[in-house]
């Protein structure tokens, strides 16, 4: 896995563990000292998402796997509002960045993807217009350039509180 995945997953699980510990009334504690602070909001859907299932936790279920694809489709970003010769307008609230990777299921339920060459609001200009895309289809972002860029720099720090006491042991020696 790449560094973006590792940073995102580690931060997300660390926050979950902190929540569990905070609600445990002292029953659980961290094995390490200090506190980690993150410069981003962890979101597992942004770096890895194949959907999920409760498996057999609630009894047997028909949705135990994804029948359409074993690949990560990413985060839902909206539906296709219109398709023009060189651009696609998306209905939704997602912000797009140049270089984002988007995908969709075509009419044969096959996963297809394309790269956003340029984005202006909710209008995207693909590097190459995808075939098989039609109005009303759901779009998913499986590569989020803004999130990737955010995580390439310093994204976390760990601070440990200390108490120090300094004494002079000999004149001039501390």
Predicted segment positions?
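Surface-exposed amphipathic alpha-helical tracts and adjacent flexible/coil segments at the periphery
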Residues: 1-174
């Amino acid at each position: 896995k790449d560094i973006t995945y590792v940073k995102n997953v580690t931060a997300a699980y660390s926050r979950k563990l902190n929540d569990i510990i905070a609600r445990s009334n002292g029953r659980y504690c961290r094995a390490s000292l200090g506190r980690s602070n993150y410069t981003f909001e962890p979101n597992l859907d942004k770096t890895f998402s194949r959907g999920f299932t409760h498996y057999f936790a609630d009894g047997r279920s028909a949705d135990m796997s994804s029948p359409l694809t074993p690949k990560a489709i990413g985060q839902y970003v909206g539906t296709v509002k219109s398709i023009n010769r060189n651009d696609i307008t998306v209905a939704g609230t997602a912000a797009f960045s140049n270089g984002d990777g988007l995908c969709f299921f075509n009419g044969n339920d096959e996963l297809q993807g394309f790269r956003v060459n340029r984005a202006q609001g909710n209008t995207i200009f693909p590097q190459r217009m995808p075939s098989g895309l039609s109005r009303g289809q759901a779009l998913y972002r499986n590569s989020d350039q803004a999130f990737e860029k955010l995580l390439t720099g310093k994204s976390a720090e760990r601070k440990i509180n200390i108490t120090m006491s300094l004494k002079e042991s000999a004149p001039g020696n501390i």
